[in-house]
């Protein structure tokens, strides 16, 4: 069976409204694609994080009158009368199987593997974490997550306490626990991130050693041997006083979510308190690490 697809460009402001409208008039699915190869982080549960310039693609049954779809879009006021678009025929595929085939176990450092649940674990003796990829949470596919996982794998976490600041899916906290940490603490501003972390920790058998807090409920005088924060450069600089107090004396700090061009300004925010290591880059992103003096 073939399908008909309409593809049009939008801004992030209107993309979701266009998506909702296409579904209302019969689209069997709507997907978003980056129009300009702009970096974007893996969104949290319930969040649709869109690019500033987004292509919206609506898939319709082959019998659909696509001119009527175009006319309805114009009438809705969501697009201009002369909006650029493309209609094409799409051959049927097993879309779910094709999506699943794109994901394989990924190794980070020497010991750590992140595995989708439908894949066989490559090394039973390795530190294996089961997380399914999708829009709901980060699974290590983003370079900044990979940089943090590699760093954690290289530390001796035995008996240590780790704080995952901006925990999202909990992937970093869970990895730390599987790598030998005694306890991990996840902090995030989004209640859905807390829920995702709880579920993922339970699936990996470490829920009893993971404490989770919304940032507004973060305990006073909280400190850990290791603190990792994979958020954006702006918040890393703005929240530097708070993040620095979370690290015990002689403790370790790992920061990512930083473009390589932003590394110097982030380093300046922490250099007075930490002896910083050389910046590590991956693609256009980087990781900053150091020891509290």
Swiss-Prot record:
One of its GO terms (molecular function) is protein-lysine N-methyltransferase activity. The keyword Cell membrane does not apply. Keywords: Cytoplasm, Methyltransferase, S-adenosyl-L-methionine, Transferase. S-adenosyl-L-methionine binds at residues 145, 166, 188, 230. It comes from Haemophilus ducreyi (strain 35000HP / ATCC 700724). One of its GO terms (cellular component) is cytosol. Methylates ribosomal protein L11. Gene3D superfamilies: Vaccinia Virus protein VP39. It comes from the Bacteria. It catalyses: L-lysyl-[protein] + 3 S-adenosyl-L-methionine = N(6),N(6),N(6)-trimethyl-L-lysyl-[protein] + 3 S-adenosyl-L-homocysteine + 3 H(+). It is found in: Cytoplasm. This is Ribosomal protein L11 methyltransferase.
């Amino acid at each position: 069976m073939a399908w008909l697809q309409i593809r049009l460009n939008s801004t992030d402001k209107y993309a979701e409204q266009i998506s909702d409208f296409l579904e209302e008039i019969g689209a069997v699915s709507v997907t978003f694609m980056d129009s300009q190869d702009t970096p974007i982080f893996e969104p949290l549960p319930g969040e649709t994080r869109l690019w500033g310039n987004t292509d919206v693609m609506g898939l319709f049954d082959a019998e659909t009158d696509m001119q009527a779809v175009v006319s309805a879009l114009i009438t809705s006021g969501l697009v201009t009368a002369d909006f650029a678009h493309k209609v094409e025929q799409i051959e049927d595929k097993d879309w779910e199987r094709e999506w699943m085939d794109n994901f394989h176990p990924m190794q980070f450092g020497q010991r750590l593997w992140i595995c989708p649940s439908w894949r066989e674990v490559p090394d039973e003796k390795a530190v294996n974490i089961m997380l399914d990829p999708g829009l709901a949470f980060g699974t290590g596919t983003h370079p900044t997550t990979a940089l943090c996982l590699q760093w954690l794998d290289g530390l001796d976490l035995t008996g240590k306490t780790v704080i995952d600041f901006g925990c999202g899916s909990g992937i970093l906290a869970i990895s730390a626990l599987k790598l030998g940490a005694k306890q991990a603490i996840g902090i995030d501003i989004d209640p859905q991130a807390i829920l995702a972390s709880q579920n993922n920790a339970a699936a990996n058998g470490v829920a009893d050693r993971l404490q989770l807090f919304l940032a507004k409920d973060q305990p006073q005088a909280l400190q850990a041997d290791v603190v990792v924060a994979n958020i954006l450069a702006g918040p890393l600089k703005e929240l530097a006083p708070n993040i620095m107090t979370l690290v015990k004396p002689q403790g370790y700090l790992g920061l990512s979510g930083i473009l390589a061009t932003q590394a110097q300004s982030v380093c300046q925010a922490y250099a007075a308190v930490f002896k910083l290591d050389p910046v590590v880059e991956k693609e256009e992103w980087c990781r900053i690490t150091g020891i509290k003096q």
